[in-house]
């Protein structure tokens, strides 16, 4: 009995079966993969063996590609771009699905472009150039870490030992240049840098290498980073030995090229030349696969990490091919339409085929994840293999031994990374350590890694050539041009505590007419023009970003200085006049007293009497003119004339004195409007600052003061002048803002000023060095040691306490005191009239005395005989004149009248003779 099936249903079922049930494609019997690399190279010789072994193992594993055989086709690039490119095209003609290699980074750049154009995967096991990026070369993969990863390990090693500056020696090709560029980037992250670069060509002769290394010796750092391709000759170390650069002062760090080279050497005697060199070696974890591979190739002792990566690369491509075949994708090839247009040329590019599923194979390779003999094979971002640890190797005279391990997340340790992970440690930064290292010269003590200076190349130190406050630092203005000052002495004394010799020279900076700008000083240290700067340099954040400062050797802070009011008002009544004017006024009273007494003595009874009475009358008369009308009246016209002028002068003096004293007392009672930086900031008065210092930057940017308010000043003389002029006069200021050491020196030399408010913006003075200079740390330690002695106080006393160290100012005469020159005109008039009156009086007395002497000669009255000696006669004459002047004017006139009457009436001759002798009162 047959089944009745509807034909339409049968057809539908057949279609569903065809669409749903997968059909296995015909697996190819043979799949070609290509390899382009330098056969006759340190890496190439080992890699060739590893590649052949890998293909053999893949084909022997029947559970893997099943009946498909993997065939390896190899072309020798000879580290040549042209030969490498030609070899790549040769392989493409033979229908390869993927290509392995090359070793050379320069060849890798070219073949990566070919892979990009023809869409086939290119997998390198040794091209470590970090610029071979997935963005630029999307079909390029590598199963070895790039140099950026290796440089990260090397920089951690540099940072582990505290070195900040290095010299890089590298091959002048893509590998060397781009590797050192990655090193520079990693060093920058650690605040370190490459001080000098030595590019070397593979064709450089011994003379060139010698000159290049010899030139680098003049640079301070002694840490050398070597980055080349493997060099079996190791010429660089022979030359370094000849130049005595393999001593205890030097550090030689090599990337993994050295370990690859050493693994290929059969003569261990070569190690003697490399004593103390430290390098990196890719860490290959122990595994069963590794043991099996090592046992299989035990006859080949030149095997290295890159050869192991080559072995894993073959397996990785095999995994990708297996994934493609399992998905039923056929291995097919096509001619490139672009290359078909080249038909007929001698290059025969039309024969080149490309794999149709190249992009799919690339996707499968990127998803590969298996454990190879070199470790885990898995790609991360940037299409670089994930994870790679390094061994830190050290060369002694007889062997190469491992002193530790490095991992990206774990840092350094003497325990292998696999062991640490098994102990479930997640952070090893605090436990970082390495084993004992033999350094160049055979020592175990870590080299300092740099030389500050030597006699041939001393430390160049720039110092400011100050023209004000020269006690701190300046250049002597004589033939010696010696640099001296407080800061210089501190530096020299601190340098004695540095545990090594530092030859140095001082070079002054500035035009000698004004103090230099200290920011320019710092910038020159940053730019490498000078190695350090010594002087009164304030440590401020903007400068600390450019240079490294030592420990402050002097504490500073900004302070506000204003004119001071004297708190002691005991002698305030003397301030309106200068001391010179007071002396002149006092002398004037005495002179007027004497002149009036002389003019009034003969005719005024009030000015006669005993000498004591006359002296008191004379002084009281003169000084009482200040306060009230005199009891004694002047009689003579000459005395009245003198008194008129004197009283006028006295009136002007009194009025001026009263006005000035009132002003002083008023100001004395008014409190200063400026009490500190806050009140100064709130006001609009002009402010002085020292030109060239950071004060201007702080006042404008930090406190927001208008630049128009700020007046640059450059010396203590300008400070004093500006403060005395005050804010109302052009060029004057209400206050000065400056650092405390300058102000202390200013107050020690200039009095009449004071500090108001508390110091602010507390900073210090330090010595500036180039960034990451080790001398900055050693000088800081030296300054701390110096401060524990009395030497720092002695230096301060020597330079800053020449006048006084009290820091408090004494009173200075008022700026608006009245001087003698203010009354010079009045005094000249008074002196002229007084002298004239006195001369008139004297002439009158002489005339009367002459007449009196004639009367004596014509009279018959006997008189004393004259002395024979002229001197005695002159003295007698003077005494007679004084006695004559002392007589009353009335008696003299009466005598003269009687003499005149006797001449007219002879009868009176006897009477006159009787009265010829002048009466004495």
From Swiss-Prot:
It holds the Pfam family ANF_receptor. The keyword Ion transport applies. The gene is GLR3.7. It is found in: Membrane. Expressed predominantly in leaves and siliques. Also detected in roots. Belongs to the glutamate-gated ion channel (TC 1.A.10.1) family. SUPFAM superfamilies: Periplasmic binding protein-like I, Periplasmic binding protein-like II. This is Glutamate receptor 3.7. It comes from Arabidopsis thaliana. Residues 1-25 form the signal peptide. Its main location: membrane. Residues 602-608, 630-640, 844-921 are cytoplasmic.
């Amino acid at each position: 009995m047959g089944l009745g099936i509807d034909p339409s249903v049968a057809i539908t079922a057949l279609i569903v079966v065809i669409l749903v049930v997968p059909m296995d494609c015909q697996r190819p019997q043979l799949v070609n993969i290509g390899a382009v690399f330098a056969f006759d190279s340190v890496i190439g010789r080992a890699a060739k063996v590893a590649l052949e072994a890998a293909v053999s193992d893949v084909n022997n594993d029947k559970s893997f590609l099943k009946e498909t055989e993997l065939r390896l086709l190899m072309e020798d690039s000879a580290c040549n771009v042209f030969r490498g490119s030609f070899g790549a095209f040769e392989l493409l003609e033979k229908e390869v699905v993927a290509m392995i290699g090359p070793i050379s980074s320069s060849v890798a750049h070219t073949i990566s472009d070919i892979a990009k154009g023809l869409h086939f995967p290119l997998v390198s096991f040794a091209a470590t150039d970090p610029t071979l990026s997935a963005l630029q070369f999307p079909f390029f993969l590598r199963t070895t870490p790039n140099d950026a990863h290796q440089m990260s390990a090397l920089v951690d090693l540099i940072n582990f030992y505290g070195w900040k500056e290095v010299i890089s020696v590298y091959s002048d090709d893509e590998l060397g240049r781009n590797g050192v560029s990655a090193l520079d980037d990693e060093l920058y992250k650690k605040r370190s840098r490459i001080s000098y670069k030595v590019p070397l060509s593979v064709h450089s002769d011994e003379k060139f290498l010698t000159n290049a290394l010899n030139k680098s010796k003049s640079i301070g750092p002694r840490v050398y980073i070597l980055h080349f391709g493997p060099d079996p000759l190791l010429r660089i170390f022979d030359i370094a030995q000849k130049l005595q650069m393999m001593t205890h002062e030097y550090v030689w760090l090599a990337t993994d090229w050295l370990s690859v080279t050493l693994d290929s050497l059969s003569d261990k005697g070569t190690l003697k030349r490399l004593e103390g060199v430290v390098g990196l070696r890719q860490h290959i974890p122990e595994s069963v696969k590794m043991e099996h591979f090592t046992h299989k190739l035990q006859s080949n002792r030149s095997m290295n990490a890159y050869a192991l990566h080559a072995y894993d690369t073959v397996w990785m491509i095999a995994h990708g091919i297996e994934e493609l075949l399992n998905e039923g994708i056929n291995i097919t090839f096509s001619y490139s339409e672009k290359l078909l247009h080249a038909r007929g040329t001698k290059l025969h590019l039309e024969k080149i085929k490309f794999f149709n599923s190249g992009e799919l194979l690339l996707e499968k390779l990127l998803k590969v994840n298996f454990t190879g003999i070199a470790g885990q094979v898995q790609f991360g971002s940037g299409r670089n293999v994930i994870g790679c640890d390094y061994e830190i190797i050290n060369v002694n005279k007889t062997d190469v031994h491992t002193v530790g391990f490095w991992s990206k997340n774990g840092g350094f340790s003497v325990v292998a990374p696999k062991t640490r992970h098994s102990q479930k440690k997640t952070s090893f930064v605090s436990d970082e350590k390495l084993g004992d290292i033999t350094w160049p010269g055979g020592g175990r003590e870590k080299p300092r890694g740099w030389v500050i200076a030597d006699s041939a190349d001393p430390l160049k130190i720039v110092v400011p050539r100050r023209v004000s406050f020269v006690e701190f630092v300046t250049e002597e203005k004589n033939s010696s041009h010696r640099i001296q000052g407080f800061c210089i002495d501190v530096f020299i004394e601190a340098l004695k505590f540095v545990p090594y010799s530092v030859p140095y020279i001082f070079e002054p900076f500035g035009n000698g007419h004004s103090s230099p700008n200290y920011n320019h000083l710092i910038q020159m240290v940053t730019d490498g023009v000078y190695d350090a700067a010594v002087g009164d340099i304030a440590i401020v954040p903007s400068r600390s970003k450019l240079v490294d400062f030592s420990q402050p050797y002097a504490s500073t802070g900004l302070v506000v200085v204003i004119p001071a009011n004297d708190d002691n008002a005991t002698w305030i009544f003397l301030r309106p006049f200068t001391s010179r004017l007071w002396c002149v006024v006092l002398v004037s009273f005495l002179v007027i007293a004497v002149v009036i007494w002389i003019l009034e003595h003969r005719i005024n009874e009030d000015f006669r009497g005993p000498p004591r009475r006359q002296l008191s009358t004379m002084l009281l008369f003169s000084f009482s003119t200040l306060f009230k009308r005199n009891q004694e009246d002047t009689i003579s016209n000459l005395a009245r004339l003198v008194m008129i002028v004197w009283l006028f002068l006295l009136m002007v003096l009194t009025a001026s004195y009263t006005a000035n004293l009132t002003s002083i007392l008023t100001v004395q009672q008014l409190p200063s409007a400026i009490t500190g930086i806050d009140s100064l900031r709130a006001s609009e008065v002009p402010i002085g600052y020292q030109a060239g210092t950071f004060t201007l930057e702080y006042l404008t940017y930090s406190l927001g003061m208008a630049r128009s308010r700020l007046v640059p000043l450059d010396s203590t003389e300008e400070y004093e002048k500006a403060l005395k002029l005050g804010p109302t006069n052009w060029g004057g200021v209400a206050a000065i803002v400056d650092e405390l050491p300058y102000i202390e020196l200013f107050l020690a030399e200039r009095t009449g000023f004071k500090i108001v408010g508390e110091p602010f913006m507390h900073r210090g003075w330090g010595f500036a060095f180039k960034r990451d200079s080790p001398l900055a740390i050693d000088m800081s330690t030296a300054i701390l040691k110096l401060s524990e002695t009395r030497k720092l106080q002695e230096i301060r006393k020597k330079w800053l306490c020449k006048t006084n160290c009290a820091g408090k100012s004494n009173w200075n005469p008022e700026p608006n005191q009245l001087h003698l020159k203010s009354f010079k005109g009045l005094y000249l008039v008074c002196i002229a009239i007084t002298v004239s009156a006195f001369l008139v009086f004297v002439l009158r007395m002489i005339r009367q005395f002459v007449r009196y002497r004639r009367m004596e000669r014509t009279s018959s009255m006997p008189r004393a005989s004259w002395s024979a000696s002229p001197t005695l006669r002159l003295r007698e004459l003077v005494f007679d004149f004084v006695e004559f002047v002392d007589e009353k004017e009335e008696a003299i006139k009466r005598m003269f009248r009687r003499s005149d009457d006797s001449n007219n009436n002879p009868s009176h001759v006897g009477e006159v003779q009787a009265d010829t002798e002048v009466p004495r009162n």
